[in-house]
Amino acid sequence: MFARGWLLGALLLMTLATVSVARPSLKIDLVNTSAPEEPPTKNQNCVPVLFSVHPGELLKLKCPLSGADDVVWTKDSSSLRPDNRTLVARDWLQISDATPKDSGLYSCSATGLRDCDVFSFIVNVTDAISSGDDEDDTERSDDVGADGEQMRLPYWTFPEKMEKKLHAVPAANTVKFRCAAAGNPKPKMRWLKNAKPFRQEDRMGGYKVRLQHWTLIMESVVPSDKGNYTCLVENQYGSIDHTYTLDVVERSPHRPILQAGLPANVTVQVGQDAKFVCKVYSDAQPHIQWLQHYTKNGSCCGPDGLPYVRVLKTAGVNTTDKEIEVLYLPNVTFEDAGEYTCLAGNSIGISYHTAWLTVHPAETNPIETDYPPDYVEIAIYCIGVFLIACMVVIVVVCRMRTSAKKPDFSSQPAVHKLTKQIPLRRQVTVSSDSSSSMSSSTPLVRITTRRSSAHDDPIPEYDLPEDPRWEFSRDKLTLGKPLGEGCFGQVVMAEALGIDKDKPKEAVTVAVKMLKDDATEKDLSDLVSEMEMMKMIGRHKNIINLLGACTQDGPLYVIVEYASKGNLREYLRARRPPGMEYSYDIARVSDEPLTFKDLVSCTYQVARGMEYLASQKCIHRDLAARNVLVTESNVMKIADFGLARDVHNIDYYKKTTNGRLPVKWMAPEALFDRVYTHQSDVWSFGVLMWEIFTLGGSPYPGIPVEELFKLLKEGHRMDKPANCTNELYMMMKDCWHAISSHRPTFKQLVEDLDRILTLATNEEYLDLCAPVEQYSPSFPDTRSSCPSGDDSVFSHDPLADEPCLPKYQHINGGIKT
């Protein structure tokens, strides 16, 4: 009876002890109501102590019975014996890696003591697992139903934390949805997406469910993860559900973007009101200021080169975005005339636009003079005749000048002129030490189209602002043979005299990009934008650098470096030995055998070039061996910025236009969600590595484009090339990780390749007789039914029709656009 009473008391205390962390010793007095109090005698228990620990932790109990000759440990009235987890000492009991089965009533007993000879511990090993990502442990204690609780249907334990139903998060972030619940018996939870069961294969990269915390976790979310997520909690007595809505926001780290043409110049009279408007677009919260420029001692700038400005208006706590975007100047005076700047900044950088305020004197009321009516009418007629005569003379002179300059158009009747201004995608900076040659205002390409009634073909002209740092005289440029052409442009070899400023009298072989005769206004805008992109990126050894441009008095010429050995894919294929599948020109085979170190060097140089582009906030989007050029000294240079975009452009990360896409080089998030990041370039770099170590092999050989989509979703990757080490193949597979955030950065790739290149030796010649195309031989080497380029490189975007994007190839050292 005595032991049974202790067990009932222990069960009652364990029911009350549903806590998540071990607390200091809690003393509970047990009162015997069936008999009066007596002095402590033998076989009388001391006050029990309550302990609570987590699973996996160390349970350590110390028997406080001092002076005992012998101590015996028991659990639930059964003797404890040492084993691989249990250590029983004289006055210590230690259990490692505790589990819920270790919960119970522990006692240590001794003989020969005056006060008491049994001391008890009530141990509760909770089944809640702590996590720094979820709520604290005291909240989790309510998620577990106690054994003594009455049967009931599920209920939410923290409904106040589930009130936020709409969650909008940036792409590539981690999302957690929690539905903490309880019930007796303990309910089960399952998740639905858009009212359908949510399975692991429904999402690229899968998801995690932490049942102990009632939590759904999705890493690196993409736009396809948008939808309604419902947690359904149920037991045999009923069910409850709660729905969260997830919206994945496309965001790109960029400084504020100001709308072109705002603020505009304003002209008012003295006493009138002036108003400037500045439209700011920024993902991160921008800070906006209005500045007024002034002069001091006749100078507009200080000794440090910075302009003198005073802050007129700044964003504050009580200021809305629409209020700060408008500068209102009431009752202006002549002192208010001058330059005003709208300055916007965020954590990424700052941008600004400037406008001028012109103040004219107020109009005075004309003095009324009583002229005879006849004289007023005569004056009006004379002035009208004079103005008409002036207009006729001006028109005749202008037509004569136009005819003298362009005799081809003089014979064409009824010529109509349509003028259009196209803003360039050019970066704006306020840094005093910036190396950019671009001014603060966005330059415009002014395109004039002449259309004659006798000829249907438009004749485009353009007016591009001259950039002194890059302008090159046409007289010093001698065009040579064509190197290639594409959808809208062509590339020719040329000799540029004095383009190397260190050797002003020496001619340098260059490549010149230009438009074809049937190019459109969009083609011109694309070529100018590519030129501006190359200006912004700057110079690096492992990219094709801009050397100059001819923008005045003639067609637009973009002058770039010339690579004599063509593109990397043809360079590798031409050095294959006889007998391999690719047909090659024997006359182009190099006498120098390729070594393993040569291939690692190619990979290392391309990684360095991509590391530099990433540091300049530029994403290539079309990295492949066909877009890497090889110079005479075997230097790898990344080319083809036709698809490249600066991440400061707000519409860059998600491709909204349609056209031809290099699907076999594209990362899954770019292929399926059209999300482009530096990590999607890393995926393409892994495919380029595979091309290098197969000596110009075609990725996924024999796999149709339609089948490729399915294989990528199922996690299939290309096999290890024959000429590749296990370490380099693991590097490729790291680049092909399904979750973009788990891929290495270009900086890490450069460090690893530098180490491998240092350890490689020139004597490691390649076994070039091994087969190159070894992936999935069950598929015949057939082309996709979709229109594609070489080796099924490109696939049409099925969303809409659009002329093909520029695709560059290289023939005999040239660039094919």
UniProtKB/Swiss-Prot annotation:
It catalyses: L-tyrosyl-[protein] + ATP = O-phospho-L-tyrosyl-[protein] + ADP + H(+). GO terms for cellular component: cytoplasmic vesicle; Golgi apparatus; plasma membrane; receptor complex. Pfam families: I-set, PK_Tyr_Ser-Thr. The active site is at D622 (proton acceptor). The modification Phosphotyrosine is found at Y462, Y582, Y652, Y653, Y765. Residues 161-178 are annotated as: Heparin-binding. Its EC number is 2.7.10.1. Keywords: Apoptosis, ATP-binding, Cell membrane, Cytoplasmic vesicle, Disulfide bond, Glycoprotein, Golgi apparatus, Immunoglobulin domain, Kinase, Membrane, Nucleotide-binding, Phosphoprotein, Receptor, Repeat, Signal, Transferase, Transmembrane, Transmembrane helix, Tyrosine-protein kinase, Ubl conjugation. InterPro entries: FGF_rcpt_fam (IPR016248), Ig-like_dom (IPR007110), Ig-like_dom_sf (IPR036179), Ig-like_fold (IPR013783), Ig_I-set (IPR013098), Ig_sub (IPR003599), Ig_sub2 (IPR003598), Kinase-like_dom_sf (IPR011009). Its main location: membrane. Residues 477-766 form the Protein kinase domain. ATP binds at L483, G484, E485, G486, C487, F488, G489, Q490, V491, K513, E561, Y562, A563, N567. Tyrosine-protein kinase that acts as a cell-surface receptor for fibroblast growth factors and plays an essential role in the regulation of cell proliferation, differentiation, migration and apoptosis, and in the regulation of embryonic development. Required for normal embryonic patterning, limb bud development, lung morphogenesis, osteogenesis and skin development. Plays an essential role in the regulation of osteoblast differentiation, proliferation and apoptosis, and is required for normal skeleton development. Belongs to the protein kinase superfamily. Tyr protein kinase family. Fibroblast growth factor receptor subfamily. This is Fibroblast growth factor receptor 2. The lineage of its organism: Eukaryota, Metazoa, Chordata, Craniata, Vertebrata. The gene is fgfr2.
